[in-house]
Amino acid sequence: MAGAVSLWRREAVFLTAMLAGETSIVGLSTLFKVATSKGLNIYPFLSYSYLLASLLLLPSLFFTNRSRSLPPLSASILSKIGLLGFLGSMYVITGGIGIEYSNPTLASAIGNIVPALTFILAVIFRMEKVSFKERSSVAKVMGTILSLIGAFVVIFYHGPRVFVASSPPYLNFRQLSPPLSSSKSDWLIGGAILTIQGIFVSVSFILQTHIMREYPEAFTVSILYILCISIVTSMIGLVVEKNNPSIWIIHFDITLFTIVTTGIITSVYYVIHSWAIRHKRPLYLAIFKPLSILIAVVMGTIFLNDSLYLGCLIGGILITLGFYVVMWGKANEEKNKLLSFSGKEKTPLLLSGKNDQI
């Protein structure tokens, strides 16, 4: 009996941690949307917040288990991590710009097509094979099609309102800033940019898989990766905003709060992610990703006074179904591999989420 209670408590801790992690990530997107309306520029935001996150994660290097021997950090590995950092920078920049044009709900919905995009790229690069004789392969193809159809519906079909937001004044950030809703043209631009973001994420996952095979130390790779994002976004910001140096001065208002909160939550989220993946299969973490759509809808309604449109609802459902079908196909494929090649170690591609980018 005591063992069963202990098991339930353990599962409850995992469940709470994952829900808190997804909620915090969507919350950061909502907070960023508000802060940009108060003058926060994306480049100092990313530069400062990721620098803070890397500094907060640095002590973890002294507590991680280094019992296994690792290859030295060669120039080849460092260059690949640098490339991963560049791709990550493109990912967070396009993600931030996409949210500025649209809202966190669209960002969460489009974010769930990443497994489908990763599968497409893996087939193109011949890292995955499509065989319609295998259920797992059929599932991944069907899930990819569902996800892409859902993405097109979310972006191109607004539809009528199915829920009109009405939030209390003390929770409504629109009292503090200009209107945060997006026009139809901005929505389309935001959707296109967020789709490009998904492509960057998918390419990053493929590169990340190769890096982790050569240097399987997640904390070290992640800290260097996050630090690279801070450096690259700073360099891009200095070039793009060279005539506007005042953006690098942060005031003691919601902009500073957003940067500090993002840095802290990014580091904490990674710790939760690494802890969960150490005790659970990567599929367990993936199961919670579609919940970000629901969380974004709730937060957008409460804090941004966003309304829910039929297109977003239908597209979100299709994307969620496609997501789970792709993940089922990948899980079934990995299960078959383990049964057939029990003596070999395989690194999952779509299920590998050791450095889930933020």
Curated annotation (Swiss-Prot):
Molecular functions per Gene Ontology:
transmembrane transporter activity
Q: Which GO terms describe its cellular component?
A: membrane
Topology class, membrane: Multi-pass membrane protein
Which Pfam families did the record assign?
EamA
- Keyword Hydrolase listed? The answer is no
Instruction: Please list every transmembrane segment annotated in the UniProt record, as residue ranges.
Output: 12-32, 42-62, 81-101, 105-125, 137-157, 187-207, 219-239, 245-265, 283-303, 308-328
The reply on keyword Transmembrane is yes
Q: Which InterPro entries match?
A: EamA_dom (IPR000620), WAT1-related (IPR030184)
Q: Which domain of life is it from?
A: Eukaryota
Q: Where is the EamA domain?
A: 27-155
Tell me the keywords, alphabetical order. Membrane, Transmembrane, Transmembrane helix
Cellular compartment(s)? Membrane
Q: What's this protein's family per the entry?
A: Belongs to the drug/metabolite transporter (DMT) superfamily. Plant drug/metabolite exporter (P-DME) (TC 2.A.7.4) family.
Q: What is this protein called?
A: WAT1-related protein At3g28080
Q: Which organism is it from?
A: Arabidopsis thaliana
